[in-house]
Design a protein with these regions (language model features):
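Bacterial N-terminal signal peptides that target proteins for export
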Residues: 2-11
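Short, structured beta-strand segments at or near domain termini in extracellular proteins/domains
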Residues: 162-180
Length: 213
């Protein structure tokens, strides 16, 4: 038996709503042009985790990220650490790279990204040239300003190294998304919800009339 027109509309509305909700709940999204959006942290990573092609000291790494222009955006920076986690610690997921390492890549303490090089981890495979090594963060280590924070993707540790003597990689990131979210999305979802509610009420009234006959 064919569905009634009202039921078809309701089914379509539910399907569209579910699709939009799934999109909104996505974590890592390939935006193209070498950029990956993290909807949980609301930041956009460079897809190429070694775009510079070389290790640098901290100041050169900062300058490199600041000079980048990718996808018409020029507000790139190095990732943020989390000083509250502390020095030489694992499982620091508030650290932006730590969140990517532990939450998105699903790695554990001491495991390292090299375990994913030839695997089928969908999140990890969105990126290229991820190094199993040390990446500078964009902040000084306050107790010793000759040092700066870093994150080691070989072990999953957050720590700090000498700004001048330490030669590590840089992985640029920027705040926010690189694609504007349609302003009508929320209104559309709300409207579809009202449509479903109206359909349910209408069917309820029809059943009540039939029961009264």
């Amino acid at each position: 038996m064919n569905m009634r027109p009202l039921n078809k509309i309701l089914a379509g509305a539910i399907l569209i709503t579910c699709c939009w909700m799934n999109l909104a709940n996505a974590t890592l999204i390939n935006r193209g042009n070498g950029m990956i959006y993290d909807s949980v942290q609301n930041i956009t990573w460079l897809q190429n985790a070694n775009l510079s092609g070389t290790k640098m000291n901290w100041e050169d790494s900062l300058a490199w990220a600041d000079s980048l222009s990718v996808g018409s955006f020029d507000d790139w920076r190095l990732s943020n650490p989390d000083p509250i986690c502390g020095l030489a610690v694992y499982n620091c997921t508030v650290n932006e790279l730590g969140h990517l390492f532990y939450n998105e890549f699903g790695l554990t303490q001491g495991q390292g990204v090299s375990s994913l090089f030839s695997g089928t981890n969908a999140n990890f495979n969105l990126f290229i040239n991820v190094q199993a090594s040390v990446y500078w963060s964009g902040a000084e280590y306050a107790p010793l300003t000759a040092s700066a924070w870093y994150f080691n993707t070989k072990t999953g540790i957050q720590s700090a190294g000498n700004k001048q003597k330490g030669l590590y990689y840089g992985w640029a990131v920027r705040d926010g998304d690189v694609v504007a979210v349609p302003a009508f999305r929320s209104l559309a979802i709300f409207g579809l919800g009202l449509l479903g509610l109206a359909a349910c009420k209408r069917q309820g009234r029809q059943r009540a009339k039939l029961g009264a006959v």
